[in-house]
Amino acid sequence: MNRHLCVWLFRHPSLNGYLQCHIQLHSHQFRQIHLDTRLQVFRQNRNCILHLLSKNWSRRYCHQDTKMLWKHKALQKYMENLSKEYQTLEQCLQHIPVNEENRRSLNRRHAELAPLAAIYQEIQETEQAIEELESMCKSLNKQDEKQLQELALEERQTIDQKINMLYNELFQSLVPKEKYDKNDVILEVTAGRTTGGDICQQFTREIFDMYQNYSCYKHWQFELLNYTPADYGGLHHAAARISGDGVYKHLKYEGGIHRVQRIPEVGLSSRMQRIHTGTMSVIVLPQPDEVDVKLDPKDLRIDTFRAKGAGGQHVNKTDSAVRLVHIPTGLVVECQQERSQIKNKEIAFRVLRARLYQQIIEKDKRQQQSARKLQVGTRAQSERIRTYNFTQDRVSDHRIAYEVRDIKEFLCGGKGLDQLIQRLLQSADEEAIAELLDEHLKSAK
């Protein structure tokens, strides 16, 4: 269980009985952190620093914390109510005559609750099996029944694994699904504008390569849309379309400012041989279908011009580059990656649709007026989300206080990056459960 959920359960005024001793603390693993305004809805006029942050939860502690969450009265009451509602719906659909419109509504709700009710019942049955096993162990004679005790211990371990799996399955079912999670994305990277910009440009290339390698690691398709190189092997700007299974779900928290601290090895900054700090930005745009964003030709201005950069005499003779201007919003998209004007126009339209789609998503979220802001961040493009400290060989994600060593391995875009992304997803899921319980408690008052 994530520390944010521990904090919520520990501090909530309605949840009496959740004692501090239930949280197993090891002082050398924990450090203080001030919880920012993203958690304001849960602390409600409390200003405090909570000492509940672990950089590395062991699997044993995760299982214990998951069990504590399940045992808590708030979640137990919530699941009891859902189970009762499911049973009532089942009886109503079987025995009480209702009109067709109401029946469709009841069937939809019944289908929503069926998986949760099934998991809840299985958890109760498994807990009953644990109680019976513990009762049997207490009645055994230590000397005469040693073999039975060993068998009982093995059985208990098997049941523990099963019930932990059921807990996780239940929590996954409780988390609301985002409708954009299955979308493909357009990923853009841009070097920061700071003194000694070559360090930013080199870092931008490394981050772009990292996401390209991660796409291979996840067996996604990576299509290059734009690539503007810089001096000393750096990168000014690049964009790519990434398509595959659950791309936006995994990359949606990568958008933001990535910071680097290092002694440059090449470029003008390398002459001073001191630590430099630079930044680059990542933008992750969910890719819409044609039906999601319709472009009216009257709202567009299409300009063509000669491409810049390497390419021989061709770039000086043909107007292959394309610029699209969406007049109502003022969005401007350029593409000069391909030698063909038709291909550049196709890519530019694709990027423009993605940016307009992002505006639709943000507007949709504002209209929902959800009180929840993910602990993993607001995903604002101006938010600094991660620091890559080369001198200390450490990557730090500031949203969940996660740290990992071996930067070179992390930048390979394999297991290290995937583990961090999974932790971000877990943190967001657990915050969603905390909000769910918070709303349930408020409605019960």
Swiss-Prot record:
Q: Which residues carry this modification: N5-methylglutamine?
A: Q313
Q: Where is the transit peptide?
A: 1-61
Q: Name one GO cellular component term.
A: mitochondrion
Where does the UniProt annotation locate this protein? Mitochondrion
Question: Which Pfam families does its entry note?
Answer: PCRF, RF-1
Q: Which InterPro entries match?
A: PCRF (IPR005139), Pep_chain_release_fac_I (IPR000352), Pep_chain_release_fac_I_sf (IPR045853), Prokaryotic/Mito_RF (IPR050057)
The family database entries (SUPFAM superfamilies) matched by this protein are listed as: Release factor
Q: Where is this region: GGQ domain?
A: 297-361
Motif, GGQ: chain positions? 311-313
Tell me the keywords, alphabetical order.
Answer: Methylation, Mitochondrion, Protein biosynthesis, Transit peptide
Is Transmembrane there in the keyword field?
no
GO MF, one term, reads: translation release factor activity, codon specific
Post-translational modification, briefly? Methylation of glutamine in the GGQ triplet by HEMK1 is conserved from bacteria to mammals.
Q: Which GO terms describe its biological process?
A: mitochondrial translational termination
Q: Which PANTHER family match?
A: LD18447P, PEPTIDE CHAIN RELEASE FACTOR 1, MITOCHONDRIAL
What's the stated role of this polypeptide? Mitochondrial peptide chain release factor that directs the termination of translation in response to the peptide chain non-canonical stop codons AGG and AGA. Non-canonical termination codons AGG and AGA are found at the end of MT-CO1/COX1 and MT-ND6/ND6 open reading frames, respectively.
- Fill in the domain comment: The GGQ domain interacts with the peptidyltransferase center (PTC) of the large ribosomal subunit to trigger nascent chain hydrolysis.
Q: Which family does it belong to?
A: Belongs to the prokaryotic/mitochondrial release factor family.
* Protein name stated in the entry: Peptide chain release factor 1, mitochondrial
Q: Which organism is it from?
A: Homo sapiens
